[in-house]
Amino acid sequence: MTTAFYLLPGARLPQGCAREVLASLTDADRTRLTALGTGREPPGIQRLSEPLHEYSPHRAWLWKVLTHRTGAPVIAPYAWMAEHGPRLDQEFWSIDFWTKDPSGRLARFEFADDALPRAACAAAPVLAESGMRLMISGKSFYTATREGLDYSARPFEDLCGMEETHIAHLPHLADGADKERVNELLHRIEGALREALPAETQDIQGLWLSGGGRSAPVFPPSTFRSVLTNDRTALAWAEDAGIPKAYLGTLGKKTKWPEAPEGDRILVIDDLYDAWMRHDWNAWIKRMPGLLDKLEHWVGQEKPARLTENVIVAWARNLRN
């Protein structure tokens, strides 16, 4: 038997609002949603991610099943390689700058093109003093180190959209023996940037280091035959796990399953994820019809791909929250 695994980040609602949100769906959409569970075994609940990664359990699942590696997902070196950077035998970390959007939520800050060289010149010496090297791809900042850090932090992608009242809790979303060292390093980088680019850094509220680890080819290779997702990092994991590029892709560019060898496949539909992250249940409701349309389309493509069954995995944070 061959299985299609449909991962739906943000599809499980918190218990406190689930009844009300589901009642707000149209009768037709609620019927379509209910039909997904008809004839299936009772759902099982599995905890896959540590508290620092609880907002992206689908990534924790992909990391474990594709790479056969335990622990927190390693993001930064694979994001670097997804941007066509070379594999380096060093520990990679992402350096992100954050600001607040007009609603007060945490948002990514990016330097303008003409400010990037000056920002790099300001940050690089500070990192070098700590035995690290600045790496830039596009507008993304990374740092590489041979020594490694005893440090873990919530992935920056999971912070974006955080409500203003929760931003004060940022210090609690990082851990490890090197936490103070990292905080001091980020403070010095921020100071150097503000000195070199006083006007361009006015909107920066802080810096964040996350996603660290080393990339390594997976052996034995994954038994999954194809992965379709809009997550470039997950696609890099899949490629490192031995799945050929021809059998990988994004949903926007694929309308049918790749002509891969017979075997299990993974497809991630993330239409609800951003709304779920923001607890924007009106947006969640509006996006549900599109998710159901996509899911029905791909289920209809299973037979030509020699898939005999499917598993629907609906992801959530803590179901009690």
Pin down the residues of each PLM region.
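A contiguous, mid-domain pocket- or channel-lining segment that forms the substrate-recognition surface
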Residues: 73, 78-186
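A contiguous, surface-oriented mixed alpha/beta subdomain in the mid-to-C-terminal portion of proteins
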Residues: 150-281
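Short loop/turn segments at strand-loop or loop-helix junctions that form parts
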Residues: 8-10, 95-101, 266-274
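C-terminal regions of proteins
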Residues: 257-266, 270-321
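An N-terminal, globular interaction/scaffold subdomain
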Residues: 18-117
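Well-ordered, non-membrane alpha-helical segments in soluble/globular domains
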Residues: 25-26, 113-124, 182-189, 281-295
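N-terminal basic/disordered segments at the start of proteins
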Residues: 1-18
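Acidic carboxylate-rich catalytic motifs and surrounding loops in phosphoryl-/glycosyl-chemistry enzymes
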Residues: 135-142, 208-210, 302-309
